[in-house]
Amino acid sequence: MSTTEPSPENDRDPQPTTISTPTSTNAKLLKKIPAIPFRHSDKEGEDEQAKTDEVTTELAGEGPMSHDSPEILAPSSLGLNHIRTKSSPAPSPLRFSSATPLISPGQDDKDVAKEKPRVGVVDARADARARWPIPPHQPDQGKKVQWSQSKSQRVPANSNPGVESTHVGLAKETQSPRFQAILRVTSGRKKKAHDIKSFSHELNSKGVRPFPVWRSRAVGHMEEIMAAIRTKFDKQKEDVDADLGVFAGYLVTTLESTPESNKELRVGLEDLLVEARQCATMPASEFWLKCEGIVQKLDDKRQELPMGGLKQAHNRLLFILTRCNRLVQFRKESGYVEEHILGMHQLSDLGVYPEQMVEISRQQDLLREKEIQKINEKQNLAGKQDDQNSNSGADGVEVNTARSTDSTSSNFRMSSWKKLPSAAEKNRSLNNTPKAKGESKIQPKVYGDENAENLHSPSGQPASADRSALWGFWADHQCVTYDNSMICRICEVEIPVVHVEEHSRICTIADRCDLKGINVNLRLERVAESLEKILESWTPKSSVTPRAVADSARLSNSSRQEDLDEISQRCSDDMLDCVPRSQNTFSLDELNILNEMSMTNGTKDSSAGSLTPPSPATPRNSQVDLLLSGRKTISELENYQQINKLLDIARSVANVNVCGYSSLDFMIEQLDELKYVIQDRKADALVVETFGRRIEKLLQEKYIELCGLIDDEKVDSSNAMPDEESSADEDTVRSLRASPLNPRAKDRTSIEDFEIIKPISRGAFGRVFLAKKRATGDLFAIKVLKKADMIRKNAVESILAERNILISVRNPFVVRFFYSFTCRENLYLVMEYLNGGDLFSLLRNLGCLDEDMARIYIAEVVLALEYLHSVNIIHRDLKPDNLLINQDGHIKLTDFGLSKVGLINSTDDLSGESSLGNSGFFAEDGSKAQHSQGKDSRKKHAVVGTPDYLAPEILLGMGHGKTADWWSVGVILFEVLVGIPPFNAETPQQIFENIINRDIPWPNVPEEISYEAHDLINKLLTENPVQRLGATGAGEVKQHHFFKDINWDTLARQKAMFVPSAEPQDTSYFMSRYIWNPEDENVHGGSDFDDLTDTCSSSSFNTQEEDGDECGSLAEFGNGPNLAVKYSFSNFSFKNLSQLASINYDLVLKNAKESVEASNQSAPRPET
C-alpha cells in the first residue's frame, strides 16, 4: 500500500492527500483531483501533531504523554481514520489536492500485494477502517481569532516525505499505549450478530443497566398519549383512594370528639365525610369526568368558611383531590379537549358550572368567528395591495405551546373566587370585547418589534442610493482590511472582517439550502434555485448602461416587492418544509438601525409601548430580501458569469443519476471547473466562494455515494472471485462509508464540538455545564438531559416546547439559544453562558436586597414578561433560580416549557408527610400494604422542586393564564426584600395550605418595607386572577408607583447596581438549590462527565444518524397499552443561524468600539 505523508497545511482547510485501493480495477475509478488554491500568501503550519495528540489522549481517557516518548508514528501509515477534533473542517480527498492524486497512477496489484504484510501486523480491527491519512492539526485552531492577527487563506502544496520504519519498529509501536488510544478512538463500526436485539437507550459506559418502570407516551399520537395519561390517572386514583381512607378516619375521629352542640361543625365534617366516601368509591372513569367539578365546588365552599378546623379539613381534602385534577388539567392543556369556557371565576360564583356552559361557549364562539370574519373582509377590501406586499416578510409565528388565556376567551376552567370584581374591574372587562380580541388576533406578530412590519411594505424599502451607503457602513466606520479576519460562527470558516455582514447573510442562505435529512440531489437543486433567483435580481455589470440604471431607478417598489415575495416564498417554503419557518427565520437589522444602536443608543418600540434596545437578530425581512436589497453594490464585488457557472455546475451534478464510471469522470470534470470559478473570484467570503464551497461539499457527498453504489454492485457480483480480492473490495466499501469524510456525520453538531470545562448547576430535569466551542473558543452553557429521564417523567413534549420557545424569542431579557442536538442517551441545549450566576445564588450570599436594587431587577422581569406575553408565551415557572444575571448585571429569563410537566411530576412531592398508618377507612389490608410500599417508592423517586412560587389556580389544577406569572413576580419581590418566600413552610402540604389561604407573614411597614412595595406585593398576590394586578397587561404593573423612578425606555442600557467581576470561565456565582452529589450519579451510569464522553463517543456518534435518535419501543417498559410507536428525537437537532450571525455582529461592533477607544486614547489632547 503506497502512502505519502500530508504536508503541513493552512489551519483553515487541512486536506488529506492519498487513498489506496486494493485492485487495479478500482485504480481506474478515481483520478487526479485538482486543487482549489486560495489567493493569499503561503504560510506553512507548525507543530502539526501537537493538538491531535492532546485530543487523542483525552478521548482515550489516558494521561498526558511523556515528553521523552519515542518518535511520533504517523497514523496515516497504519491506515487509520482521521481523528475528529472538530476544531477544523474534516478532510476531503476531493478538495485542494491537485498536488497529490487520490491513488498512485502507477500502482498495480503487485504493489498492493507487497504492502499487505505490513498491514497484517496491525490489529485485525484496523482492516475494517478507512485508509485516509490524518491531516496536520495547527496549534492555533480552536482559539479565538485576535483582531491584530493576519491569517493566510491559501493552502501550500509541498511534497510530503514518506514514513520509513521497519517491521520490528512497527510491531513495537502498535503495542504502545498511545497507539492503543488512537486505535480505540478511530475504530469504525463493528459488525454485530443479526440475532441480537440491541436497546441502545439501555446502554451506558458500563454496559447494560435496567431502568425503573417506564411510563410511556408517544409524541404526536393522540391515542397513545391519552391512554398513557389515563393509565397514570388510574394509578394516581389508587393512591388518592388510600389517602381518602386515612382522611375519612381523621374525620370520624374528629366527629367523635366534637360536642353535639356544635352542629355547624358536625354538619360540615359529615358532608366532607360523605364527599370523601363518594370520591373513594367512585370508579376511575367516572372520577375522571367529575373530578374538576368536585374540586371547584369544594373550593367555593372553602372560601366561605372562616379560619378554623373545618376550613383546614377542606384544605386537606383539596390537597388530596388536586393530584388527580392536575392530570385532567394537563390533558386539557395538551390540546386534546377543546372546551371553550368564557366565564372564568365570576360564573362559578353564580352557580354556573361546565355542564351548563357548553351551549353558551358554542354561541360565543360563533359570534366571535363572525366578528373576525367581518373585520377580515373590511381589511381585505381596504388594504389588499398592502397585504400582498407584506406576504414575503418573516412574520412572527405565535408560539402557543403554553396556552394563553384571558378573561373572555379561555380554553380552560379556572378556580372560582368568593370576591366578585369591583366596578373598575367590570369596566375593564367590558372593554375587552370579542371584537377587540378578534382585531388583536389578526394582527401580524413580529417578535421584538411591531414597527418591523413597515419593512415589508414598499415604503420600508430603502432606495438604491441608501442601500449603497448602508452596505458600505462596515468598511467606512471600521476601516478594516483583509489583514483582519475572524471565524464565521455559522460555517466556522475564516472570513475577512470587512465582509462579515454580507457573508453572514449569504452563508445563512447557503446553510438553509443544505438542510439535513434531504437527499443530495434535492439540496443541490435548492442551491441552484437560490443562485437562479440571485441572478434574476442582479443585472450583469457588463450590461449596465446609464439608460438601464435610470430605468431600474424608475421601477416601482411594488413590482420589485413582488419579485422579492416570489423569492422569499420559494426559499422560505420550499427549502424549509422540514423545519417550521419560525425556527429558521434569519434576519439582520438594517444597518441604519444598528448604527443608531451603536452610535446614538437608539431604541425600538415593544409590544406595550415601552422602548427596549433592538436585538441584533430581530426577524424583520427574509434573508433573501435583505441580501438582494443591496445588489447594486454587491454586483461590483461579484461576477455574473461566475455565479451563472456555479448554477450550471449545481444543476449538472444534481442531474447525474447514472451509477457508473462515466458519472464519476463527469463529476471530477465539474469539480475542476468549480475550482477555477472559486479561484477567480473577485472577493472572499461572498456569493461565489460561499456557494462554491457549499456546492463542492455536496459534490463530494454525491461522489462518495456513487462510489459506494458501484462497489456494492462489485461486492454482490464477486462471489466467484478469490477471497483476497473479495476482502479487498469489502474494505473499499467500508472505507468509503466509514471514512470521516462522510458529510452527514461531519456536518452534524455534536458534543465533540465542545470542550467541557466544568459543571455549573443542577436542576430538576438536568444538569448544566460550562463548555467551549473548539473551533471558535466561544463559551456556552450546555444543558444535558437524559432521554430516558425525559420519557420516564413525561417531559418529552416539555423539552421540545422549551427548545421551540428559545428558538423563537428575541429579547434582551431572555437568554439566547444557539444549538440543540442529540446523542445515543442525551439531549443537549446550548445557550449563552451568563457568568453572573442567578438571583437565587445572589440571595443566598446577601440574604436580601435593598429596595432600589430589587426595583431594577423586578422591572427587568416585568419587561421580559411583557414581551413573552405579547407573543402568547406563559412562563409558569418563574423563580429566582430561573433569573440569570449577565456580565453587565442585567436579568435574563431562562428555563421555558418545564413548568407544565414539572407541575404534574411534582404531584408526588406535594403529597406531604402525612402518614397512612395501618388502618385505612375504605381500603382493605392488601391495598393498604401495597399503598404503603408505593409511598416509600415515591419518597425515593420524588421529583425535586418547590411549589412556593406557583399560583393557587395552578396548585388547584384549574385553568390559568398570564396572570399566573404575575403571582410569581409578587412572590419573588417578597423574597428579594424579606429574604424568604412568603408561603415558605417545612412540608409541601403546609406550603399548599399557606398559598390557597394566602397566609402571608407581612414585615413591618414602613420600617422593613415601604408602603409602595407592600401595595405592589399585595396586588400581585391577589387570589382572584381577574382582579390580580397585571390581568389587563403589563402596562398596569409598570404604572404602579413602586416603579415611579424607572425609565422603561433606557432600562436595558442603564448601568446595573451589581456587575459581576468574575473571569469568563468562573462559575463561582452559581449556587444550585439542589445538592450536587456525584456519588449518587452511579444510578445513571457514571459521573457527570461520563454522559458527555463515554455515552457519546467518537465512534458511536459517527455512525449515529439523525433518523436513529430513538429510544426504541416502549411497550416493554410501561404499564399502559402495548405501543408500537417509537420515541424519536430525529427533529431535535437545530442550528440557530440568526443568533450565530448575531455573534458575528457583536464581535464586529466590539472591535469597532475598541478601535474608537484606542484611537481616542492615542490622539493628542489639545493644550489648555
Swiss-Prot record:
InterPro entries in the record: AGC-kinase_C (IPR000961), Kinase-like_dom_sf (IPR011009), Prot_kinase_dom (IPR000719), Ser/Thr_kinase_AS (IPR008271), Ser_Thr_kinase_AGC (IPR050236)
Recite the UniProt keywords alphabetically: ATP-binding, Growth regulation, Kinase, Metal-binding, Nucleotide-binding, Phosphoprotein, Serine/threonine-protein kinase, Transferase, Zinc, Zinc-finger
- Catalytic reaction(s) noted: L-seryl-[protein] + ATP = O-phospho-L-seryl-[protein] + ADP + H(+); L-threonyl-[protein] + ATP = O-phospho-L-threonyl-[protein] + ADP + H(+)
Bias (Basic and acidic residues) ranges: 39-54, 107-130
Return the Low complexity bias intervals.
16-25
Which E.C. number(s) belong to this protein?
Answer: 2.7.11.1
Q: What is this protein called?
A: Probable serine/threonine protein kinase IRE
